[in-house]
Amino acid sequence: ARLAHLRPKNPTFFAYAATVPARSFKQKNECHGWVGIRLQLHPGAEPSDVVMHVRMLDNDNAQQAEALGILGVNLIHGAFFNHHHPEWVVEGLADGLGSERIEVDLIHFSGPYFDEVENRLMNLHLIRSWLTRAVVFNPAGEVVVPGELFYRKPVMVIRGSFKPVTCVNVDMMAAGLRQFSQLAAVDQNEIVSLAEITMNSLISGDNVDGADFLARIELLASQGYTVMISDYVRFFRLRAYLRRYTQKPIGIVLSVRDFDFLFDEKYYEGLEGGILEAFGKLFPDNTHVYVYPSRPSGGGAELVTLDNVQVPARLRHLLAHLVENDKLLAVQPLDDSHLHMDVADVIAGLRRGRGAWERDVPEPVAQRII
């Protein structure tokens, strides 16, 4: 308005800003910060914003400055020319860079041009575009910066598809937290309860069902969980990701039903040291896996626990070593009435409509689904 009598009749404006500290010569500090653009696409229109949090991965500040410049050009170009397709804005951010130079772990679109943009889906698209390996949502369902959330916090993780959240999921986390909070280095009030979903469980064919993804986020948030979507298939890579931000204890609660997966040597093909390398990277420091029991379906079936779970004969001594050294810890359920539950039966029942499945999920979850 102040320039109305001086400027041409039909200008549009934009402002670009980046606040990222350069890497110090003396210290290998984490280089991360905020980058954003505020733009008009039509003269006199209300502005819209695209803001993102970035991590610079180059080893010196000259390379980082170059990468930040390329990122800025990509953002400005995408915001002006691809604003009708925000997925294209995301996909174009790494043009000329690649994922080895920069990571974008949060992006937020706002303003009149982006009224219909679902920011949670755009952040999921960051993973699909190889701009990050994980995105995090707080219990309010809002996308948050992982480094700020996990910084110096103990973290308890449960991995699953959560389609839907079941009573077993809830009891696993509650029982695991009860034991995890007893560790000397854990302040119960600081624990981050993290439900992790891998991208593999969200993708059907080549596509992600956006409505299904949002429903899972909302159901987990209703139970008070922080949610992380990642493409970390192997547990030790998940642990390494969390170790970027915290040196406090990390706990992973796992059903004994998943031991076939954990102790499957094919799962570790491609690692030079195989399963030994994987477990060495999973348990190097202050990390524990809490093993939750299960009861096979059918009346009178024996409870399967960490003490009697079967693994391949050649791996029994490895299992014994991990148990003896308190790397694998047995969890005592708080509610053993659902130990026989099979999530496949819950899903099948849910598809048929109301029924017995409602007893196998928390009441607030059942009410949301109904």
Where do the model's predicted regions map?
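Nucleotidyltransferase catalytic core that binds NTPs
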Residues: 1-370
